[in-house]
């Protein structure tokens, strides 16, 4: 919703369903009931072109999609001849410990949206899909002014050559171990009264700021962002209530640099508890 503000009229109709995840308390059953209501009240299932899912929500707070729901949705799409599209722009290329995050869901999408890591920071996006779908497009029928930029494509090829599964697994596992162990240390020490849950998977992690009653603490997150910025660490918020810190470092970050960033974050969390009380 925050990204729709001041954008103007959006193409439609587009419908949204609850995102079932262990990180937000929405169950698979609740999401499936919402889908049943959607097709009973809002739209005829025969008018649906596709479902778009994020295996791990990015702006939503690094929430992991429920496996049971993903598989039920895949079966539903197969039964109704609806395309299933996986948005892997943030989660793709090893962020979650696997080349693509949808792998952990036990499904295969019809189309995959890629970007960000695909070219090592050079602007490039891509759509990957089943041959039977993409071969239906006429040559040159899908493009844009800057499509096929040769420098960006060369950067992507070099990046993909470097991104072997072995490298991705090692890089992702190292980051995950560092982040999870540090978070667990903070929890055991009760570092901050606002330290909430750790969301996400692999090296794609979010740290929730919450009040004592479990409610989101977006004001404290705003304070934390300022403290971190003054200490030389740039952080970004996420989540519906903008109360979750995104940890999304380059997979190639040196271990010492990652630890330095976590050290700064630790100090800022301590200061946050002092200035907010």
Model-derived segments and their meaning:
Residues 1-277:
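Conserved N-terminal phosphate-binding loop of PLP-dependent enzymes in the Aspartate aminotransferase
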């Amino acid at each position: 919703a925050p990204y729709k503000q001041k954008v103007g009229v959006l193409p439609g109709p587009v419908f949204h369903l609850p995102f079932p995840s262990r990180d937000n308390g929405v169950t698979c059953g609740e999401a499936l009931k919402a889908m049943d209501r959607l097709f009973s009240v809002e739209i005829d299932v025969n008018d649906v072109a596709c479902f778009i899912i994020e295996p791990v929500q990015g702006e939503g707070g690094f929430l992991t999609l429920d496996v049971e729901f993903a598989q039920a949705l895949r079966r539903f799409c197969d039964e109704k001849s609806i395309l299933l599209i996986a948005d892997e722009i943030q989660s793709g290329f090893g962020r979650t410990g696997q080349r693509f995050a949808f792998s952990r869901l036990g499904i295969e999408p019809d189309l995959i949206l890629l970007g960000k890591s695909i070219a090592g920071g050079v602007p490039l996006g891509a759509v990957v899909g089943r041959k039977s779908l993409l071969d239906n497009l006429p040559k040159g029928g899908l493009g844009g002014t800057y499509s096929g930029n040769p420098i960006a494509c060369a950067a992507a090829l070099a990046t993909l050559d470097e991104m072997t599964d072995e490298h991705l697994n090692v890089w992702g596992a190292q980051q995950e171990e560092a982040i999870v162990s540090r978070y667990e240390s903070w929890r055991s020490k009760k570092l901050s009264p606002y330290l909430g849950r750790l969301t996400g998977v692999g090296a794609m992690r979010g740290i929730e700021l919450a009040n004592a009653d479990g409610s989101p603490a977006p004001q404290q997150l705003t304070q934390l962002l300022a403290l971190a910025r003054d200490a030389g660490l740039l952080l970004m918020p996420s989540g519906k209530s903008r109360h979750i810190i995104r940890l999304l470092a380059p997979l190639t970050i040196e271990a010492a640099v990652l630890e330095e960033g976590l050290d700064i974050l630790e100090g800022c969390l301590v200061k946050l508890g002092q200035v907010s009380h």
